[in-house]
Amino acid sequence: MTTNKSYLTYFTDALWINNQPLIAILGICSALAVTTTVTTALTMGFAVSFVTGCSSFVVSLLRKITPESVRMIAQLIIISLFVILIDQFLKAFFFTISKTLSVFVGLIITNCIVMGRAESMARHVSPIPAFLDGLGSGLGYGWVLVCISIIRELFGFGTILGFRVIPEILYASAAHPDGYENLGLMVLAPSAFFLLGIMIWIVNIIRAPKTKR
């Protein structure tokens, strides 16, 4: 039972307590490009979770036989393998989304979260905790992207997951020039950084001890 709780802690801590984008401020560059819609954010979150979880598992599995002098090269090779797998999977079964994400799936190999979990956690613990930590870190990254993308897609396009949320009748037209208009700022990349900054601020307020408020 204690072991199970310990394993669960690796996962839950990565989701919230040690959330990589909000606490460590890692992996934030992709927030610019992949959060214009919820669909792309979900896909990137899934891809990073897969790569981080699987690569952490393999790095941990091979940690005792990997020479210290080449450990980072070995980690990059392992990460590259899973990046290629998820990239090919998306191209085969979700080609439209893969085309939308373009090179950003391949650039997961440069995501600081993936190498960070391999270097700081996976090579120090057994495979199961390493996998749970990697999976939790990926999902923690994913839910941050989804939160940002919901706001950007809703106010930038009036939709969520491609479904119309803001009725067409409310939009400005020749007959109703004072109607609603989408916020063009939300479609632009800087809006993601503003939203991420607000999320970090909110999380810091929630996490701050009551005595410091």
UniProtKB/Swiss-Prot annotation:
One of its GO terms (molecular function) is oxidoreductase activity, acting on NAD(P)H, quinone or similar compound as acceptor. GO terms for cellular component: plasma membrane. One of its GO terms (biological process) is sodium ion transport. It is found in: Cell inner membrane. This is Na(+)-translocating NADH-quinone reductase subunit D. It is an enzyme of class 7 (translocase). It catalyses: a ubiquinone + n Na(+)(in) + NADH + H(+) = a ubiquinol + n Na(+)(out) + NAD(+). The gene is nqrD. It is a multi-pass membrane protein. Keywords: Cell inner membrane, Cell membrane, Ion transport, Membrane, NAD, Sodium, Sodium transport, Translocase, Transmembrane, Transmembrane helix, Transport, Ubiquinone. Its EC number is 7.2.1.1. It comes from Chlamydia trachomatis serovar L2 (strain ATCC VR-902B / DSM 19102 / 434/Bu). It comes from the Bacteria.
